[in-house]
Amino acid sequence: MADKVLRAKRKQFINSVSVGTINGLLDELLEKRVLNQEEMDTIKLANITVMEKARDLCDHVTKKGPRASQMFITYICNEDCYLAEILELQSGPSAETVFVTEDSKGGHPFSSETKEKLNKEGGAFPGPSGSLKFCPLEIAQKLWKENHSEIYPIMKTPTRTRLALIICNTDFQHLSRRVGADVDLREMKLLLQDLGYTVKVKENLTALEMTKELKEFAACPEHKTSDSTFLVFMSHGLQEGICGITYSNEVADILKVDTIFQMMNTLKCPSLKDKPKVIIIQACRGEKQGVVLLKDSVGNSEEGFLTDAIFEDDGIKKAHIEKDFIAFCSSTPDNVSWRHPVRGSLFIESLIKHMKEYAWSCDLEDIFRKVRFSFEQPDSRLQMPTTERVTLTKRFYLFPGH
């Protein structure tokens, strides 16, 4: 029976499931009335960590019997093939679960169908929602074995507590609304969650409030049991820094990029010493443009704009040098960055696309190079993303799925 299978796989499920899959399961089970709204809210709000949510969800479903458990298992098989392989689950045509026995201890069992898929795709296979490609265990182990002295170590999933911070300013008192920023925020949050980070999201802040959030984030105790962090800033900007929501010609509400590095350095955030700290900045860095389009920079561009264009632009200052940092900015100094009101920012869109496609096999700097190359093409000459102040001493592999 499905409930017995689910009970047998409870521990593996708790240790392996991602927050994205948990959220998908909750939505599915609510829609099919396996869970009611109160149960769903309890699972989401009464539990802090992903593992706690997973444990509570699994226990709720198994108590409801085989039919509820079968819906749970079927969703995993259909939507998260990586997790289904780890749990050794298959959903047959009759909706009965087939329990697949493990051939060898310590191995990573894949079905013949999955193995064929791995060979075709060079080892990767889609993660939740068919998006992020996860790294098969044997490939992760091979990379680590051959290059461990040159790779930042990652902590084990059950005990690590990765955190990420996203600050997104959309609505301003004196500047235009950043239409399309909601797409960037949603997609970036989902990506980081699938990479194993608990994401803290803060919206529409002044420079002072952004500094306060940085201070609180740097002090989070979870960093002690984390192996890395991401900080993502999306706002209007100019050469001096990132605009707060009250910026105007009279009010210099600007977060200097140096402040970000100072708040996250070894002195202010010792828990992240010798661990990768990745800073992503989507904002303008000045007024110059390679083409003439609507933009998000604060000042007036000397080059004007095209009235029929639907792109808009966004900016920052050079980063402060610190060990184990890497900053990836949406444009070169003094230039604008562009945002589509429906698709979101060109930079964020390309970054997410390449992270999903290559994080399983490439280190972060190599992924960033691929993003830059995507803007080199003739139809993408609007901006050139820039990697700056790189003080990483090793290669940073994300090993998605592990």
Swiss-Prot record:
InterPro entries, per database record: CARD, Caspase-like_dom_sf, Caspase_cys_AS, Caspase_his_AS, DEATH-like_dom_sf, Pept_C14, Pept_C14_caspase, Pept_C14_p10
EC number(s) stated in the UniProt entry for this protein: 3.4.22.36
Catalytic activity: Strict requirement for an Asp residue at position P1 and has a preferred cleavage sequence of Tyr-Val-Ala-Asp-|-
Keyword tags: Apoptosis, Cell membrane, Cytoplasm, Hydrolase, Membrane, Phosphoprotein, Protease, Thiol protease, Ubl conjugation, Zymogen
PROSITE patterns: CARD, CASPASE_CYS, CASPASE_HIS, CASPASE_P10, CASPASE_P20
Record-listed Phosphoserine modification sites: 301
Listed GO biological process terms: AIM2 inflammasome complex assembly; apoptotic process; cellular response to lipopolysaccharide; cellular response to mechanical stimulus; cellular response to type II interferon; cytokine precursor processing; defense response to bacterium; defense response to Gram-negative bacterium
Chief location category: cytoplasm
Entry's family note: Belongs to the peptidase C14A family.
Name of the protein in question: Caspase-1
Organism: Rattus norvegicus
Lineage: Eukaryota, Metazoa, Chordata, Craniata, Vertebrata
Gene behind this protein: Casp1
